[in-house]
């Protein structure tokens, strides 16, 4: 089926089996000039080595590789950290945060070179198709969107390999069923394989960055983090930019088996999925941020921040990065984060990270008031009137029930 002629499409290209097949498929079925766009957000060097040559051999007219690692951490990861967002209580949103920056740069390239279409390799079962296309709609509503997985009949690994062989395009992929992995500077995820059965216990093939906590060092390691307005600015008294902070803490955390989660999550499209996620640096940073939060936020602010984090986790997960509500919640979180400044010393030991010391110039904690010993600043009798008023509605309700 030959579609429109003389058109140009920008493909979000990873170099994997799917997107390698998409290039010739687009040319065959749409008669398009295919421009490959590669976002370097910290995936393994193995995935990036020779990727330009590979895309051209697959039929792309050109390949554009963008180094987005620093921008990803500074403008996407750190802002979300300020909100305290954890999807369904544990997922630090590593894949979800990466999609908007990829889509944004893909759109910018398309507009710059005069392309009229965008294409992604996300499957029709996953969240990423929604995330990409939500971003496309917000940033370039007039560009066409092509989602091959919702059109073609190449719905198995075997059929994709046969298609590439037919097109004389070489690939290192095999028929062996392997895990699906997604990696960037913030995290790595592993899905598929034995994980598709929730009764199967994950094995070490499911983990890529972190050592098994059982095999981690027998002695704990301590790390000091300095935070300024909700952002980590130094590690062990060494000032580092956001990307370097994350990389340093990834290395430290991985050595101690920190940041592993094996979860079943609710996908946006309705089904449940299981994944093994590793976010060693992010787990350490989030623990430090929460430690300072406890010192500096009053009760109402703390509760408001928890609500922001809960809502933001769904917004980011669902691909609504460029929505007005995301920007509004970010502004609220940024305001609260102005107080989150201080130092935290964390203990790293066999898969756990614990904030063991914390201090802040904005601390609301007063040892004088909190002591269980004798004090001269708090009159315990003052609690009488407070309790009478605070319990008044409960008392009236109980009296009515006795009538």
UniProtKB/Swiss-Prot annotation:
Q: Name one Pfam family in it.
A: Arginosuc_synth
Task: Please give the Gene Ontology molecular function terms for this protein.
Answer: argininosuccinate synthase activity; ATP binding
Q: Which reaction does it catalyse?
A: L-citrulline + L-aspartate + ATP = 2-(N(omega)-L-arginino)succinate + AMP + diphosphate + H(+)
Which InterPro entries does the UniProt entry name for this protein?
Arginosuc_syn_C, Arginosuc_syn_N, Arginosuc_synth, Arginosuc_synth_CS, Arginosuc_synth_type_1_subfam, AS_cat/multimer_dom_body, Rossmann-like_a/b/a_fold
Q: Which GO terms describe its cellular component?
A: cytoplasm
Keyword Ligase present in the record's keywords: the answer is: yes
Keyword Nucleotide-binding in annotation: yes
**Under which EC number(s) is this enzyme classified?**
6.3.4.5
Q: What assembly does the database describe for this protein? A: Homotetramer.
Can you name this protein?
A: Argininosuccinate synthase
Organism of origin: Buchnera aphidicola subsp. Acyrthosiphon pisum (strain APS) (Acyrthosiphon pisum symbiotic bacterium)
Specify the taxonomic lineage. Answer: Bacteria, Pseudomonadati, Pseudomonadota, Gammaproteobacteria, Enterobacterales
């Amino acid at each position: 089926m030959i579609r429109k002629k003389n058109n140009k499409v920008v493909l979000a290209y990873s170099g994997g089996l799917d997107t390698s097949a998409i290039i010739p498929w687009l040319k065959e079925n749409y008669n398009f000039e295919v421009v490959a766009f590669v976002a370097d957000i910290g995936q393994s060097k193995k995935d990036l080595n020779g990727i330009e040559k590979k895309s051209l051999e697959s039929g792309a007219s050109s390949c554009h590789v963008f180094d987005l690692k620093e921008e990803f951490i500074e403008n996407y990861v750190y802002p979300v950290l300020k909100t305290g967002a954890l999807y369904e209580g544990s997922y630090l949103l590593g894949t979800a945060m990466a999609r908007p920056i990829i889509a944004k740069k893909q759109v910018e390239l398309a507009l710059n070179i005069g392309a009229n279409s965008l294409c992604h390799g996300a499957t029709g079962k996953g969240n990423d198709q929604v995330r990409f296309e939500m971003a496309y709609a917000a940033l370039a509503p007039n560009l066409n969107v092509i989602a091959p997985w919702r059109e073609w009949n190449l719905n198995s690994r075997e059929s994709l390999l046969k298609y590439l062989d037919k097109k004389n395009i070489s690939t290192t992929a095999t028929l062996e069923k392997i895990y699906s992995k997604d990696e960037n500077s913030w995290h790595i995820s592993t899905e598929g394989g034995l994980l598709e059965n929730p009764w199967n216990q994950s094995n070490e093939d499911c983990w890529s960055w972190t050592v098994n906590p059982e095999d981690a060092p027998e002695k704990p390691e301590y790390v000091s983090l300095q935070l300024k307005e909700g952002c980590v600015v130094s590690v062990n008294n060494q000032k580092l930019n956001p990307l370097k902070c994350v990389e340093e803490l990834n290395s430290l955390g991985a050595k101690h088996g920190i940041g592993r989660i094996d979860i079943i999550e609710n996908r946006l499209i309705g089904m449940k999925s299981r994944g093994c996620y590793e976010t060693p640096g992010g787990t350490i940073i989030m623990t430090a941020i929460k430690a300072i939060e406890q010192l500096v936020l009053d009760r109402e602010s703390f509760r408001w921040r928890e609500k922001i984090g809960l809502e933001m986790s769904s917004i980011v997960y669902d691909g609504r990065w460029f929505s007005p509500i995301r920007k509004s919640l970010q502004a609220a979180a940024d305001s609260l984060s102005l107080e989150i400044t201080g130092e935290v010393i964390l203990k790293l030991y066999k898969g756990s990270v614990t904030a063991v010391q914390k201090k802040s110039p904005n601390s609301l904690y007063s040892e004088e008031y909190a002591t269980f010993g004798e004090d001269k600043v708090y009159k315990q009798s003052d609690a009488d009137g407070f309790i009478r008023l605070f319990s008044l509605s409960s008392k009236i309700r109980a009296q009515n029930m006795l009538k």
